[in-house]
Swiss-Prot record:
It catalyses: tRNA(Phe) + L-phenylalanine + ATP = L-phenylalanyl-tRNA(Phe) + AMP + diphosphate + H(+). The keyword Magnesium applies. Its cofactor is Mg(2+). The lineage of its organism: Bacteria, Pseudomonadati, Spirochaetota, Spirochaetia, Leptospirales. This is Phenylalanine--tRNA ligase alpha subunit. InterPro entries: aa-tRNA-synth_II (IPR006195), aa-tRNA-synth_II/BPL/LPL (IPR045864), Phe-tRNA-synth_IIc_asu (IPR004529), Phe-tRNA_ligase_II_N (IPR004188), Phe_tRNA_ligase_alpha1_bac (IPR022911), Phenylalanyl-tRNA_Synthase (IPR002319), tRNA-bd_arm (IPR010978). It comes from Leptospira biflexa serovar Patoc (strain Patoc 1 / ATCC 23582 / Paris). It is found in: Cytoplasm.
Length: 341
């Protein structure tokens, strides 16, 4: 039998044997018997050494074609085995396409973020723009341009976090007022929500890291009446009811006159608790008319332009909204607390 005949016979034998494989592992083992380094086709091709050059070309081509044909046969058989395996698996297993997926843990916005976005929506509906500013500020923007004197106690290192280069962590979002006055042309209305830092003793109603929403309106003939109306509108929309408030004198260097707008404590309904320090009232909104010195420092004519400003304690507002007794929960990272919102 010539080598060509042996190759043809080997291909027929291989196809018969490979067809009998019932698994991919068995198929690979049988493939090695015929096409491996020590397989039957390799053994047959050892006879090429005794052939002439022309015969070698002919038989070599036939051998390559035989190898290609068998490899294609193996892959076709492999596809059949895979399809058969999957069909068997589907026959054994049931799959309910209507069954709900396993419940997955979902995240949510922090309660402070939720109320911040709600407040932004309220103010933008009233014609305000939302501004932002850096948390690391210059002493000038945080104090100087806001009419704080050089010896003001707020500038003391016991009240403010200073950086090594002389800057500081902003103690109030009022610093954004300065940027707004320099950047915008009056009349304008802006709010500026953000995180602030103070070197304070932490307790149920005080934190060293907390959030404020600064607000400022600059225009002509702005009065205290505009300020009170804006604040009461905000509070009634946030709490979805009329809120009892009181306005009392307060001193802040960047406003004149200055006020403290307090709300009746919603945690204890005014009876007195640790949040309101047994007073029944909670300090929520330091506010007032923008001090002429602040306007002049920004290059505005204080005889033409007036305005009001306020600094809303966002953490305390959230505490009132949800009846939370301790401000420290907000920074705790306690998921049991946060998942309630």
């Amino acid at each position: 039998m010539s080598l060509s005949q042996e190759i043809v016979s080997l291909v027929k034998e291989a196809e018969t044997v490979l067809s009998s494989a019932t698994t991919e592992q068995e198929l690979d083992a049988l493939k090695n018997q015929f096409l491996g380094k020590k397989g039957k086709l390799t053994s047959v091709l050892k006879g090429l050494a005794s052939l002439t050059v022309e015969e070698k070309k002919t038989v070599g081509k036939e051998a390559n074609e035989a190898q290609t044909k068998l490899e294609q046969f193996v892959e076709a058989k492999r596809t059949i085995l895979k399809e058969s395996f999957y069909e068997n698996q589907l026959g054994k297993e049931s799959f309910d396409t209507l069954r709900p997926l396993p419940k997955k843990e979902r995240g949510s916005l922090h309660p402070i973020s939720q109320i911040q976005y709600e407040i932004e929506d309220i103010f933008t509906s009233m014609g305000f723009s939302v501004m932002d500013g850096p948390e690391v500020e210059t002493d000038e923007n945080n104090f100087g341009a806001l009419n704080f004197t050089e010896d003001h106690p707020a500038r003391d290192m016991q009240d403010t976090f200073y950086t090594v280069d002389g800057n500081l962590l902003r103690t109030h979002t009022s610093a954004i007022q300065v940027r707004a006055l320099r950047k915008l042309k009056p009349p304008f209305r802006i709010i500026a929500p953000g995180r602030v830092f103070r070197y304070e003793e932490v307790d149920a109603s005080h934190e060293n890291t907390f959030y404020q929403v600064e607000g400022m309106v600059v225009g002509e003939n702005i009065s205290v009446a505009h300020l009170i109306y804006t604040m009461e509108t905000l509070l009634s929309r946030v709490f979805r009811k009329e809120i009892k408030t009181r306005l009392r004198p307060g001193y802040f260097p960047f406003v004149e006159p200055g006020f403290e707008l307090d709300i009746n404590c919603l945690v204890c309904s005014g009876d007195g608790c640790s949040v309101c320090k047994q007073s029944g009232w909670l300090e929520l909104l330091p506010c007032g008319l923008v001090h002429p010195n602040v306007l002049e420092a920004a290059g505005l004519d204080s005889k033409k332009w007036t305005g009001f400003a306020f600094g809303l304690g966002l953490d305390r507002l959230v505490m009132m909204r949800y009846g939370i007794h301790d401000i420290r929960y907000f920074q705790s990272g306690n998921l049991r607390f946060l998942k309630q919102f």
